[in-house]
Curated annotation (Swiss-Prot):
Keywords for this protein: Endonuclease, Hydrolase, Mitochondrion, Nuclease, Transit peptide, tRNA processing
Originating species: Saccharomyces cerevisiae (strain ATCC 204508 / S288c)
Transit peptide endpoints, chain numbering: 1-122
Primary localization: mitochondrion
Protein name: Ribonuclease P protein component, mitochondrial
EC number assigned by the record: 3.1.26.5
Presence of the UniProt keyword Hydrolase in the record: yes
Cited function: Ribonuclease P generates mature tRNA molecules by cleaving their 5'-ends.
Length: 1202
């Protein structure tokens, strides 16, 4: 059990006399749980345990020894100043007595010495009260030293000797001036650290801090107990060890009770919620301690709510909603420990109580389990009253059919079949008339039929058959049929009918973790074992047809049985003389599932095979199967008392008996080497050596002998040691080669092939794990010398983020299998920084064939987020062609959404619509906006009608506004905006569109806008709407410096905000050309207004003291100017030539209205490349030649920056 590794944390070195008694309500279940799970001192002593002292004890002893050396005078005074010291003989005698008798003797000997004894406290060990020595701190050597000290007068050390200690240049720690442990300081320090860890959510550390306080008998306040308990529930340290989590939680809670601290309701909520959740998890994962967890929880629940004065009255407790819900669920899993009336009384008295759907589902379910007809009728009336009230809970109304399904089940199982039938008719008619969901019908009928099958399986089958012939009745789930079949086992013919029906169906079981708590009660749990039960019945009845169908189904549909059924299966296969091929197929299929279970099941599985089949050819096939190596790697001597290894031993013995080929040598040696490392492991070797298991002792000697014989034969045949796994050379160091001829040469043959053959892969994995810097340094050195390395080395380098192109290529080259390839590919992407992904991964020649097929969703997301060119990434991935499959689309749902979002942000609207024909866009808003912005208005209108009911009202308005704006129907856009109520306007977005429409309308009329903007985009739209520069400046000053409008003026207007506004104003000018180009070309006044707005933008940019343009801004500005003057690129080129002609080393290019473009840091090369592209697009060959000629002249005079 997991409890056995936590002896020290319970303080096993203390006596029972030091422990305080727990309260009565906590004794029964908790003490039972502790005594039966090894919580106290009931653990058996491990063999040779003296070789492995507990690390905490070692640390404590070492610390105290060092402290004694630093303060020897304190130790002397504490012993020598006593008036009646113990003699040497008495101390030796007392070493062997119990702590209780020692305390009794010391209370007699030191009754008059209470005021003279001085006792120091240690923060790393338990503190005992005055006059009580801990015998564990005295060794024989100490007793002799102390007896000598009592007879010798203490000599004061010279003052200069102490001064030498004080003059040490680098003290190990700050000098402790306290004569003993200052408990208040110690407590406050720990409180501060616990609070800090709690705030940082470092929950793993908090319990160790509390244990430090506990070891020193310091009791923290209730607030700290609350945080400790909460951290125990939340810490990830023991997420996979439920027993330990519950043990630590209950121990901490009992400590609080023992110290007579009254828990507040917050602590009750933490403890109860954790216990209820723990009991549910234990049930799911078949942990036998689940019932004990629930017993403790319900006992605590009852005790905290019972009023000792009036037993019929419930004490008020402020339980949380989660505690109430999980209590209701746990009640249904472990029924009979509390009455429904008591539970309802407590739940209804809590302020968090809500009469929601889960309350009714859980209560009906519990009343059904306890066969409480009266409670069911009361609940039914209460439910109908709640549903028909003037303002019923919306959740209750939405989930009413879930509740009705439990009501139907309750009526049938308590004998009210006729009432249930009438109610079902009414409900089905109601759903049909209201065009309700098919899932509601399926849920109602499933509950009705499953409950009916418990009462009368034949009648239930007749009803199902009638429903099955109705086209409007949906198909039932696979789980439904399994439960239906389980309830019909007494009628074997009916069972076979149901099994024949579900035999071709896909085995689709719901996951253990449900979406809602009510799903645990509405849908069957633990149905995966029903097939095992069916197989068990068929084996008992010797129904060959059903048996073989189940066995074949398990192979085809990939599922396993409970481990206890396999002996009977193999016995049956032996009786029918099953062929080896089919038998091996069955074994390999089921071994793949056994691989995922614990090691005990693996060896039990082997034992079952060997008990029924001893064929050498079969055992040879098993020992060479893929799963066998995994089984061998799980061999552990710690389990030798729990499981027999006869099956494994038989398979290994078979290695020697059968003929071997040279190809078999590496594998056989590897299997033997793994066993050698397990049998001679330092930690488990004493278990076998000191035990009485003669079979394993003989097996160990046999393995050692066979391994040395195989190694010698391998060497004599002069085979290539590079073919062997690294574990072989490791095992050679563990066996005794003294009695082997040329033992050292044999060892060198296996251990040093790299010295004479650099093609032998070296293993630096463990070196890198233990010392990353040293390991990476050694790897770099050996790589330069031409050595190669194994897969583990490269994997560890990737884990430590030491990644380059060579390591990636080599790692992929030596990757052992496809499963590991998928893991390593995703590990690489998770460890490589985002800025390097394009260079190392996306541009890798193997990206398309190796990386893409193995990418998980999170890895794909990281690549898309960090790729430098999305179009290049899409091309390499072959999107969307390789994403046609629905399964691939479901697996990469988030990645596909991100691709479409980035395409949308990049303005690739036509690409989105084209890809949508192959891989549908799930974001409807994005799809509709892409239709609008690409000019596909008819497609937008058809899609808008098709998906009208799947888009929210506010989103519809925003999309329609954008549609009207893009159609240049500004009047319609303003009308729609004015008709839209404020509550339907999307914050920011709706006003963004409205202010942009005002900007477009400013080409036709003067715009006056009085509402304050909500963001920089609206601010930029308002500024762009101004026709004159004076109006623009006045609007800017009014808004930017107003505290009531926008808080831009924090320490001066931030440069980031200014840049956003200017970029958005420039984008507005560019969008106006796209949207209004036909009108502007035909209307001179509009063209003049555009020219004025461009000029206003340039002047405003200079006014804000940010005249510099980057390359993107320059491109956009040139595009706008080119619309007004097609010769703008040529004018820019002429300006550049003149600037360079005047000053060859010019740092910037001066443009109109004082704008500047920097020619430093690749700027000159970028502008030339842009001009060349621009002239190529316009087909201006003459200017293209001029740009190229100018570039060549510049190269001669000074090198252009690449």
């Amino acid at each position: 059990m997991a409890f056995k590794s936590f002896i020290y944390s319970k303080g096993y070195h203390r006596s029972a006399a030091q422990k305080k008694t727990a309260t009565s309500f906590f004794d029964s279940s908790y003490q039972y749980l502790r005594q039966n799970q090894g919580l106290v001192n009931s653990d058996p002593v491990l063999h040779a345990s003296h070789l492995h002292p507990h690390p905490v004890v070692v640390a404590n002893v070492n610390y105290n020894n060092v402290d004694d050396i630093l303060h020897p005078h304190d130790l002397d005074s504490s012993i020598n100043n006593t008036n009646n010291p113990l003699t040497h003989e008495e101390l030796l005698y007392n070493q062997n007595v119990s702590l209780r008798s020692l305390k009794q003797q010391q209370s007699t000997n030191y009754v008059n010495n209470n005021n003279n004894n001085q006792h120091r406290y240690y923060s790393t060990g338990p503190t005992l009260p005055t006059n009580q020595y801990d015998p564990l701190n005295f060794s024989n050597r100490n007793f002799q030293d102390l007896s000598l000290k009592t007879s010798q007068p203490s000599v004061q050390q010279p003052q200069n000797e102490y001064s030498l200690l004080k003059d040490e240049n680098a003290p190990v720690w700050k000098e402790d001036t306290e004569p003993c442990l200052n408990k208040s300081t110690y407590l406050q320090t720990h409180i501060d650290e616990i609070n800090r860890c709690y705030e940082q959510k470092n929950y793993n550390k908090i319990n160790s801090l509390y244990q430090s306080l506990k070891r020193n008998d310091i009791v923290p306040p209730l607030e700290i107990f609350t945080k400790v308990l909460d951290s125990l529930c939340k810490r990830p340290l023991d997420n996979n060890d439920l027993d330990n989590k519950m043990y630590e939680l209950l121990t901490c809670y009992q400590d609080m009770i023992n110290n007579r601290l009254k828990p507040p309701d917050e602590i009750y909520n933490i403890v109860l919620l954790s216990l209820f959740k723990g009991s549910i998890l234990a049930y799911q994962f078949e942990n036998p301690n689940g019932s004990d967890f629930y017993k403790i929880a319900i006992e605590l629940f009852n005790t905290t709510t019972n009023d000792p004065k009036q037993k019929s009255v419930v004490k008020f407790r402020n339980f949380s909603k989660d505690v109430l819900d999980y209590n209701l669920l746990a009640m249904n899993i472990y029924p009979g420990h509390i009455t429904l009336s008591k539970a309802q009384q407590v739940i209804k008295s809590s302020p968090a109580f809500i009469k929601d759907s889960f309350y009714f589902i859980a209560c009906f379910s519990y009343a059904k389990l306890t066969n409480d007809k009266f409670a069911i009728k009361e609940l039914y009336e209460d439910f109908r009253l709640s549903l028909s009230s003037g303002s019923p809970d919306q959740g209750l109304f939405d989930d009413q059919f879930e509740i009705y399904s439990v009501i139907l089940s309750s009526f049938i199982e308590t004998g009210e079949v006729e009432l249930a039938t009438n109610l079902l008719d009414d409900l089905v008619s109601k759903i049909q008339s209201s065009n309700g969901l098919a899932s509601n019908i399926s849920l109602l009928l499933s509950s009705f039929l499953i409950s009916m099958s418990k009462v009368d399986p034949s009648k239930a089958y007749e009803i199902w058959f009638k429903f099955h012939n109705l086209n409007w009745i949906p198909e039932f789930s696979y789980e439904f049929y399994l439960v239906f079949m389980a309830n019909s086992f007494q009628d074997w013919n009916l069972t076979k009918k149901i099994y024949d029906y579900i035999f071709p169906m896909e085995r689709n079981l719901s996951p253990l973790k449900k979406q809602k708590l009510s799903d645990y009660l509405l849908h069957p749990i633990g149905v995966d074992s029903i097939t095992t039960s069916l197989l068990d019945y068929s084996l008992q009845l010797k129904d060959n047809e059903v048996i073989m169908k189940i066995l074949e189904e398990s192979i085809v549909k990939n599922f396993s049985f409970d481990i206890g059924i396999y002996p009977f299966v193999f016995n049956y296969l032996r009786e029918i003389q099953c062929g080896e091929d089919y038998l091996m197929r069955f074994i390999e299929s089921h071994a793949e599932f056994i691989k995922k279970s614990n090691s005990i099941n693996k060896f039990q599985f082997l034992n079952m095979i060997v008990d029924n089949f001893q064929s050498q050819s079969l055992l040879n096939k098993i020992s060479h199967a893929k799963f066998f190596k995994n089984f061998v790697e799980d061999f552990n001597l710690e389990n030798c008392e729990l499981v027999s290894y006869n099956g494994l031993i038989s398979c290994i013995n078979n290695f020697i008996k059968i003929p071997k080929t040279i190809k078999d040598f590496p594998y056989i040696l590897e299997i033997h080497a793994i066993l050698v490392t397990k049998l001679f492991d330092f930690d488990t070797y004493p278990i076998l050596q000191n035990g009485n298991n003669e079979v394993l002792l003989k097996f160990r000697d046999q393995i050692e002998h066979q391994f040395k014989m195989l190694a010698q034969n391998f060497c004599r045949l002069n085979l290539d040691p590079n073919l062997l796994a690294g574990v072989v050379s490791q095992a050679m160091k563990m066996v005794n080669l003294d009695d082997t001829a040329n033992g050292q040469d044999l060892l060198n043959f296996f251990n040093h092939p790299g010295d004479w053959d650099k093609s032998y892969p070296l293993s630096l994995g463990s070196f890198i794990r233990n010392s990353p810097r040293g390991g990476i340094r050694e790897f770099t050195k050996l790589s330069k010398e031409g050595y190669c390395f194994d897969y583990d080395t490269y994997k560890e380098l990737i884990i430590k983020r030491a990644i380059n192109k060579q390591i990636i290529d080599k790692c992929l080259e030596v990757c052992p299998d496809s499963i590991e390839l998928k893991n390593i590919v995703n590990l690489m992407i998770s460890k490589i920084p985002g800025r390097n992904l394009t260079q190392l991964i996306i541009n890798n020649p193997k990206f398309s064939k190796v990386f893409v097929p193995n990418l998980r969703n999170d890895s794909m997301l990281k690549l898309i987020e960090n790729c430098e060119s999305l179009s290049n990434f899409i091309r390499i991935c072959d999107f969307p062609e390789k994403f046609k499959s629905i399964a691939i689309q479901a697996e990469n749902k988030n990645a596909i959404e991100l691709i479409y979002e980035r395409l949308f942000d990049g303005g690739k609207y036509a690409d989105i619509l084209r890809y949508n024909n192959i891989v549908p866009v799930l974001n409807l808003e994005l799809l509709l906006k892409s239709c609008i912005r690409s000019g596909e208005f008819k497609k937008y209108e058809s899609l808008s009608k098709k998906f009208n009911d799947k888009i929210s009202e506010s989103s519809k308005i925003d999309i329609q506004l954008e549609y009207l704006i893009n159609k240049n129907d500004l009047k319609g856009a303003f009308t729609l905006f004015e008709k839209t109520p404020r509550e339907l306007r999307t914050p920011h977005k709706t006003m963004d569109l409205y202010t942009f429409a005002l900007f477009l309308d400013s080409f036709n009329r003067n715009i006056t806008y009085y509402e304050s903007p909500e963001n920089t985009l609206q601010f930029a739209n308002i500024l762009s709407s101004q026709t004159s520069f004076i109006n623009l400046l006045s609007t800017y000053n009014l808004i930017a410096h107003s505290d009531h409008l926008m808080n831009f003026n924090v320490g001066g207007m931030a440069a980031k905000v200014k840049k956003e506004i200017l970029n958005q104003m420039l984008n507005n000018l560019y969008d106006s050309i796209r949207l209004l180009s036909p009108s502007i070309e035909n209307d001179k006044s509009m063209k003049e207004k555009l020219r004025e707005k461009v000029k206003n933008y340039c002047r405003f940019k200079a006014y804000l003291k940010s005249p510099e343009l980057d390359m993107d801004e320059l491109k956009t500005l040139v595009s706008v100017e080119s619309f007004l003057n097609p010769f703008t690129p040529s004018m820019l080129f002429n300006n550049l030539i003149e600037t360079i002609y005047i000053n060859e080393h010019a740092s910037s290019l001066v443009l109109q209205n004082g704008l500047i473009y920097s020619l430093q840091q690749k700027g000159l090369n970028k502008i030339l490349s842009y001009l060349e592209e621009s002239f190529i697009t316009s087909g201006n060959d003459a200017n293209i030649e001029k740009v190229r000629e100018f570039r060549s002249l510049l190269r001669k005079s000074k090198p252009l920056q690449a």
